């Protein structure tokens, strides 16, 4: 049998590193279909930190796409698992037959599914991408994204799968003995990316709570984002006093980020699509409820796991937030499907499906 090849077709260092390390530590030892990777970006020590994997790096999307297409044409039994598919050339190859549906398996990350960019280039490309998506052999995604995808592509097979968020299961009970009182701290957004709509989110938080809460905005990632960070800071200072606004411009290491999250009482995410599952998982693990946009289908995954969900359209106050905290504290977090290690079973099944080992 031909070994499955995994494709990280865009240079998204943080997520690519998370996926590679997860495969190296959790999957490669038990499956030959979890070892071969083609990745856009620089090695930056990844090969050394992932010795169980064979990783080929490419300088850009186009060079990787050309290599994938060549392999697909040379051997029609070769199957590919695309992790977050942001590479236009690969979509066009699927549409034109350069890659066959039986070769194309896609794990939806969120931004690769929704059509939120307003630029002319994107508006012209989206219809072609929708046509190509009808030809995918199988999609893997959250419950909410599967539901969203099935509305336009009901004939494409869909399987439940969660991004392998870096988590320590021993921390599942860390919030149970914490007392929450006094001024609330609200986390706004999961990164410095504009998709978080930080300014609109700050205005929404201010409309709900006024200048009575402390707002923390993590914007250390992506890099070279100083102008937008300053734009958000100035907009925030028009709404909140300086003591109640903390805009973080430096990237935090994982442990420091965990410490930051534990200081919060609420997460506020205004974006209208599924993203930031990693941050949501870490907040939920710490017993911190989240406010979501009703258009963000991840609420379906949360309610399926009996987790409280607050919406941006709700009338929020401290009593409602504290009640959500109490509800969340009563949930057995060791049973949540999108937590580590529970998502591992889904990955093992996904590998078997993509490799053709199970129907």
UniProtKB/Swiss-Prot annotation:
Keyword Cell inner membrane among UniProt keywords: yes
Any one Gene Ontology BP term: fucosylation
GO CC terms of this entry: plasma membrane
Known EC number: 2.4.1.325
GO molecular function: 4-acetamido-4,6-dideoxy-D-galactose transferase activity; fucosyltransferase activity
Membrane topology field: Peripheral membrane protein
Family classification: Belongs to the glycosyltransferase 56 family.
Protein name: TDP-N-acetylfucosamine:lipid II N-acetylfucosaminyltransferase
């Amino acid at each position: 049998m031909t070994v499955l090849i995994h494709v990280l077709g865009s240079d998204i260092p943080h997520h690519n590193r998370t996926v590679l390390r997860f495969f190296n530590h959790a999957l490669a030892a038990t499956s030959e279909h979890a070892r071969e990777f083609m990745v856009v970006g620089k090695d930056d020590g990844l090969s050394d930190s992932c010795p169980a994997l064979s990783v080929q790096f490419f300088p850009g999307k186009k060079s990787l796409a050309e290599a994938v297409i060549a392999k697909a044409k040379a051997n029609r039994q070769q199957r590919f698992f695309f992790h977050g598919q942001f590479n236009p050339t690969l979509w066009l190859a699927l549409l034109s037959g350069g890659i066959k549906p039986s070769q194309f398996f896609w794990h939806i990350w969120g931004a690769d599914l929704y059509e939120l960019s307003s630029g002319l280039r994107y508006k012209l490309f989206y219809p072609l991408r929708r046509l190509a998506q009808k030809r995918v052999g199988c999609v893997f995604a959250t419950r909410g994204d599967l539901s969203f995808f099935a509305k336009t592509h009901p004939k494409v097979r869909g399987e439940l799968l969660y991004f392998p968020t870096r988590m320590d299961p021993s921390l599942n009970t860390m919030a149970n003995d914490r007392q929450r009182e006094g001024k609330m701290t609200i986390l706004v957004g999961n990164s410095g990316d504009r998709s978080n709509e930080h300014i609109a989110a700050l205005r929404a938080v201010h409309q709900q709570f006024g200048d009575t809460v402390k707002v923390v905005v993590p914007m250390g990632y992506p890099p070279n984002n100083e102008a937008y960070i300053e734009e958000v800071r100035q907009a925030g200072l028009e709404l909140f006093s300086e003591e109640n606004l903390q805009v973080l411009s430096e990237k935090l290491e994982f442990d420091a980020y965990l410490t930051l999250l534990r200081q919060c009482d609420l997460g506020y995410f205004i974006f209208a699509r599924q993203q930031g599952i990693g941050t949501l998982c870490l907040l939920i693990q710490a017993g911190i409820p989240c406010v979501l946009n009703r258009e963000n289908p991840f609420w379906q995954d949360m309610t399926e796991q009996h987790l409280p969900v607050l919406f941006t359209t709700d009338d929020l106050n401290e009593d409602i937030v504290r009640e959500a905290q109490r509800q969340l504290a009563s949930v057995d977090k060791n049973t949540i499907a999108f937590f580590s290690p529970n998502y591992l079973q889904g990955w093992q099944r996904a590998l078997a499906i993509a490799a053709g080992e199970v129907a």
